[in-house]
């Protein structure tokens, strides 16, 4: 997706919409999992990843949270637990909406149906990260449409440089995977939300 955006396939990015659904599971979780003071809440725990994607794809180095909400609807016996969250952001490169939840149904063959939608002024991209619902149990599906074409790309064999670069950054004290400024801004926004 980064390559397609950089090539201008969808024009200037206007908005991202990211989802971070997870499965609670039918097994015993450690006590800290339900204590906000320990895990930080659903927005810092899960939403930080979608905030990072928003900043990267909108090319924003400044952003504000315009709306944030968290709820606990399924585990009232654990008042610190949050099973739903949403965030609206406005950055100096675009807008974003993020939805997070612990509601993945048991029948889904993976732990969540994570998606990322990137809207540009000349097209859009949809990434189906972990499953292609009712079509394929595998993830890494990218769809895009612009004024010239509509395309599906199976990205399951695409090598992603991020983790290799991250390891290199740790070993060599470099910032090739992600700058410290971007990491700090991501977490600042997650904490503020």
Q: What annotation goes with each model-predicted range?
A:
Residues 89-93, 143-149:
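Short acidic, glycine-rich loop/turn motifs
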Residues 1-79:
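Predominantly a Rossmann-like dinucleotide-binding segment in NAD(P)-dependent oxidoreductases
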Residues 149-150, 166-193:
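C-terminal helix-rich "cap/oligomerization" subdomain common to oxidoreductases
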Residues 153-164:
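Active-site loop of classical SDR/Rossmann-like NAD(P)-dependent oxidoreductases
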Residues 13, 66, 128, 152, ...:
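Short, hydrophobic secondary-structure boundary micro-motifs
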């Amino acid at each position: 997706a980064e390559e397609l955006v950089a090539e201008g396939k969808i024009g200037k990015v206007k908005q991202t919409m990211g989802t971070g659904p997870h499965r609670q599971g039918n097994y015993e979780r450690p006590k800290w999992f339900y204590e906000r003071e320990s895990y930080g809440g659903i927005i810092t725990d899960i939403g930080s990843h979608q905030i990072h994607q928003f900043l990267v794809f909108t090319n924003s180095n400044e952003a504000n949270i315009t709306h944030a909400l968290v709820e606990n609807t399924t585990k009232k016996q654990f008042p610190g637990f949050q099973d739903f969250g949403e965030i609206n952001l406005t950055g100096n490169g675009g807008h974003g909406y993020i939805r997070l939840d612990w509601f993945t149904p048991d029948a889904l063959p993976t732990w969540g149906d994570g998606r990322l939608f990137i809207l540009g002024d000349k097209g859009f991209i949809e990434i189906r990260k972990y499953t292609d619902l009712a079509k394929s149990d595998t993830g890494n599906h990218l769809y895009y449409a612009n004024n010239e074409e509509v395309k599906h790309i199976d990205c399951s064999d695409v090598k992603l440089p991020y983790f290799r670069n991250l390891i290199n950054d740790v070993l060599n004290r470099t910032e090739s995977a992600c700058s410290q400024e971007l990491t700090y801004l991501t977490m600042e926004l997650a904490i503020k939300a």
